[in-house]
From Swiss-Prot:
Disulfides per UniProt: none
Listed Pfam families: AAA_15
Gene Ontology biological process terms from the UniProt entry: DNA synthesis involved in DNA repair; double-strand break repair
Record-linked PANTHER family: ATP-DEPENDENT ENDONUCLEASE, OLD FAMILY-RELATED, DNA REPLICATION AND REPAIR PROTEIN RECF
This protein's UniProt keywords: ATP-binding, Nucleotide-binding, Plasmid
Designated name of the protein: Uncharacterized protein MJECL44
Binding sites annotated in the UniProt record for ATP: 43-50
Length: 331
């Protein structure tokens, strides 16, 4: 089995250097190190080579682990240790720093626009200096589909906390709690506007929604969870806890009394939207850098999470009957 990505290396932003796969299908643990432009896996039939491709393909999605991908010993029972450990750890080197910085800065500006935070250009310049320090990224993917990102300098020193401290300055030193409240208010205003409420009644309508037990009770539970952490270093854990609360909300509409009439709103849908926007505060900065893999099977048909254009398959015809894997990063 070949893993190959060569002639377009410099058009990519990231390059996979090593990966560890644990407890995926038949794989107990597999360490693949020193990955260059071409890597060759040699093994007998049914030795698990194809499961490496399947693992990397799953890694490039947001899906939780399920079906045949879960090892037999973990089926049919809750295993907390299994869910705590990452299924896949993958290290990537940044091979196009300019493109990396351009994409991250662009995404952060998008975040600031979405959450209505003014852009401080001087601080943004300092943040660009922070991006210059980053040379490697580590992505972890867990059985529930959760991703975590760790940031390293050229000496492989973990500078994730330094990154978040710098990021916090970019967003005007607001805490996760500040930002959740800001997003909550904005989403409720948008929902009220959809109901054709007059402009001069929007504030009162939002206050009525916030005071309704169907919203206020869930809101307070979420605030309690955020307060226990409330740092960007713990951002992923905060989002996971909020998600658990949102999942418990009934997916039904409730009647809300606002000035002049009653309206129907679905708390589950609204809190889901709030969680999505809240989660994007940090993750959107890296979301488009998450690797997605595509490969050719023995019949030379394209498989995987990303569909490549025909020029890729045409250049690989000479590799017939060989399984090829190409990570598709930022183009």
């Amino acid at each position: 089995m070949f893993i190959k990505w060569g002639d377009r290396l410099m058009t990519k932003t990231l390059h996979l250097t090593k990966v560890t796969i644990r407890n995926f299908r038949s794989i107990k643990v597999a360490h693949i190190n020193n990955i260059g432009d071409i890597a060759v896996f040699v093994g007998a039939n049914e030795s698990g080579k194809s499961n490496i491709l399947k693992a990397l393909n799953w890694f490039g999605t947001d899906k939780p682990l399920g079906g045949d991908d879960i090892p037999v010993e973990f089926l049919g029972k809750e295993n907390k240790e299994y869910s705590k450990k990452p299924i896949i750890e993958a290290y990537f080197e940044i091979v196009n720093k300019d493109k990396f910085k351009e994409k991250i800065i662009s995404n952060i500006k998008e975040i600031l626009e979405v959450i209505k935070v003014d852009i401080n250009e001087d601080i943004l310049i300092n943040f660009e200096d922070m991006l210059n320090k980053i040379q490697f990224l580590k992505f972890e993917k867990y059985a529930d589909g959760l991703f975590k990102t760790y940031i390293y300098d050229d000496q492989l020193e973990d500078i994730t906390k330094e990154f978040y401290d710098c990021f916090k300055n970019v967003i005007s030193k607001k805490t996760p709690l500040d930002l959740f409240n800001l997003i909550y208010e904005e989403v409720l205003k948008e929902e009220v506007k959809k109901q054709n409420i007059p402009e001069n009644q929007i504030s009162n309508a939002v206050a009525n929604i916030r005071g309704n037990p169907n919203f206020n009770n869930h809101y307070r539970k979420i605030l309690d969870e955020i307060r226990t952490l409330n740092t960007f270093e713990e951002f992923y854990e905060i989002c996971k806890r909020i998600e658990n609360i949102v999942k418990s909300i009934p997916n039904t509409s409730v009647s809300i009394s606002i000035p002049g009439r009653n309206i129907q709103l679905n708390p589950y849908n609204i809190f889901t939207e709030i969680l999505t926007k809240f989660n994007s505060i940090v993750t959107i900065a890296f979301i488009n850098l998450k690797p997605k893999f595509v490969y050719l099977d023995e019949e030379m048909e394209l498989k995987g999470a990303v569909i490549k254009n025909t020029s890729w398959s045409n250049t690989l015809k000479e590799e017939n009957k060989t399984t090829l894997l190409m990570p598709d990063f930022l183009e």
